[in-house]
Amino acid sequence: MTLNLSVLTPNRIVWDSEVEEIVLSTNSGQIGILSNHAPIATAVDIGILRIRLNDQWLTMALMGGFARIGNNEITVLVNDAEKGSDIDPQEAQQTLEIAEANVKKAEGRRQKIEANLALRRARTRVEAINPIS
């Protein structure tokens, strides 16, 4: 049995297709979702969405939002999302290096928070390209 997964951002539909299973990064940790999962609504953290489709795992970088699961329907509404296959590895690595440098030179509470958030986003994009099995 399959699940219908929709991943939406304010500007576009990133994914709208049937899947076999997903692993979703939530604010309280990762959760695996199979068909007939109990209905839940949860906050989505900055992290990787793993999608199992035809016995292959695909990855997507999610930038926070929320998800609703029920009746074999999963709707994920996020600030931004990118399929791992759509991310330019060189650009993502450069962004990560810049973010790491910005964390080191950040001054003041607000700058440190913003720099750390940018670093989390950059790390997530790199991880989506090179998923750990």
Swiss-Prot record:
UniProt keyword annotation of Cytoplasm present: no
* Subcellular compartments: Plastid, Chloroplast thylakoid membrane
Q: Name one GO molecular function term.
A: ATP binding
Which controlled-vocabulary keywords does the entry list? ATP synthesis, CF(1), Chloroplast, Hydrogen ion transport, Ion transport, Membrane, Plastid, Thylakoid, Transport
Gene3D superfamilies found in the cross-reference section = 6.10.140.480, F0F1 ATP synthase delta/epsilon subunit, N-terminal (2.60.15.10)
User: Could you tell me which InterPro entries the record lists for this protein?
Assistant: ATP_synth_F1_dsu/esu, ATP_synth_F1_dsu/esu_N, ATP_synth_F1_esu_C, ATPsynth_dsu/esu_N
Question: For this UniProt entry, what's an example GO CC term?
Answer: proton-transporting ATP synthase complex
Nucleotide-binding as a keyword of this entry, yes or no, is no
Coarse class of the primary localization is plastid
Q: How does it sit in the membrane?
A: Peripheral membrane protein
Q: How does it assemble?
A: F-type ATPases have 2 components, CF(1) - the catalytic core - and CF(0) - the membrane proton channel. CF(1) has five subunits: alpha(3), beta(3), gamma(1), delta(1), epsilon(1). CF(0) has three main subunits: a, b and c.
What function is annotated for this protein?
Answer: Produces ATP from ADP in the presence of a proton gradient across the membrane.
Q: Which family does it belong to?
A: Belongs to the ATPase epsilon chain family.
The protein in question is named ATP synthase epsilon chain, chloroplastic
Taxonomic source organism: Atropa belladonna (Belladonna)
